[in-house]
């Protein structure tokens, strides 16, 4: 039986490719998709979800828009990374369907209530919607199998010296998720910076030759430009968000450790930092499965294989 998942995202080039990977995988049953502000404004990330599902002919999947700002902070967006639309690069189809007439939290709660088995929540943006769900529906915690997030890192940042973008946008929400008691799987920069897509990988995807693989290649063309900045020291573009889906499909591609993780919400230099107790110094019981390494070639091969689904 396919694993039921609920995807909360802020597309975003890598979010879009995570959607592509999830919907090409019969092992997964995507019950609903909710959008969050983050990589772009809430209006644009919602539109990008609708555009991607129109492209993939999956307008049957219910979609809802989430919180317009973080729990306690002003919204920060990453338009310098993802462009004016949030998915700059390819020409995407106009949406042919509308979102549900409800909030993201309402759609999440409905999805959990109606599922016969616990649902895995995959969250590839700021954790605002997930935190609101957890706080407003404690009775539904038992219906959540795990929460797989793209966010955080052990000791490095990509938005500040200490913080990864998704966590930095709403650290209070991320702290709620990590301390919820629900199993958390963390795909942080330690692993996603190793999941780089090189130019030759993009050309491999383009050569598959179907409309979706072509769009993915064009998304990567744009995404690579930002990551050419020599400060990163990258060969390609790190494909952060699809690591969450790839872990669900092929966990053997990833090396993980069980550790306690907390989120810094007040530090002068470290707001948004995920504090990973790697050496068990706090005495706290592990609350997260933390990805630390990936078989890059296996990750690329998985993407290439699943893109053929859209022929």
UniProtKB/Swiss-Prot annotation:
Q: What is its EC number?
A: 3.2.-.-
Q: Which UniProt keywords apply?
A: Glycosidase, Hydrolase
Q: What class of enzyme is it?
A: hydrolase
Residue ranges spanning the membrane: these are none
Q: Which InterPro entries match?
A: I/U_nuclsd_hydro_CS, Inosine/uridine_hydrolase_dom, IUNH, Pyrim_hydro_RihA, Ribo_hydro-like
Cytoplasm keyword on record: no
What one GO molecular function would you report for this record? uridine nucleosidase activity
Q: Where is the signal peptide?
A: none
Q: Which residue spans adopt a coiled-coil conformation according to this UniProt entry? A: none
Instruction: Report which superkingdom the organism of origin falls in.
Output: Bacteria
Tell me the GO BP annotations in alphabetical order. nucleobase-containing small molecule interconversion; purine nucleoside catabolic process; pyrimidine nucleobase metabolic process
Q: Which residues form the active site?
A: 240
Question: Which SUPFAM superfamilies is this protein grouped with?
Answer: Nucleoside hydrolase
One annotated Gene Ontology cellular component of this protein: cytosol
Q: Name one Pfam family in it.
A: IU_nuc_hydro
Q: Which family does it belong to?
A: Belongs to the IUNH family. RihA subfamily.
Q: Which function does this protein serve? A: Hydrolyzes with equal efficiency cytidine or uridine to ribose and cytosine or uracil, respectively.
Protein name from the UniProt record: Pyrimidine-specific ribonucleoside hydrolase RihA
Taxonomic path? Bacteria, Pseudomonadati, Pseudomonadota, Gammaproteobacteria, Enterobacterales
